[in-house]
């Protein structure tokens, strides 16, 4: 399991995904925290380098697009594919990581 929660800019999180997501074992997770930034009012991130359109969720969307369009290999040599696991979001009801629970399939 890999948990990403540092700088929240799109480029930084995308780079983290490229580096660390390939380490995730099949059936395990890459969790990207604070994807909810995309859904916040601009005023909540006014003093930050991230905000709507430039955040962890947009990086997740871009990374999944790259996986689909370009493909990637995992560290174990298998194809790297992730699905959103909404069962976690539904169980906990409130989360800072909508679209951020990525299960390797």
Write out the residue ranges for each language-model feature.
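C-terminal substrate-binding/active-site "lid" region of AdoMet-derived donor-dependent transferases
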Residues: 10-105
């Amino acid at each position: 399991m890999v948990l990403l929660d540092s700088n929240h800019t799109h480029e930084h999180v995308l780079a983290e995904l490229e580096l660390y997501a390939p380490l995730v074992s099949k059936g395990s997770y890459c969790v990207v925290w604070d994807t909810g930034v995309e859904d916040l009012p601009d005023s909540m991130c006014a003093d930050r380098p991230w905000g709507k359109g430039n955040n962890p969720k947009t990086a997740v969307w871009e990374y999944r697009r790259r996986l689909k369009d370009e493909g990637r290999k995992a560290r174990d040599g298998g194809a790297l594919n992730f699905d959103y696991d909404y069962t976690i979001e539904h169980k906990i009801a409130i989360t800072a990581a909508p679209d951020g629970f990525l299960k390797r399939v």
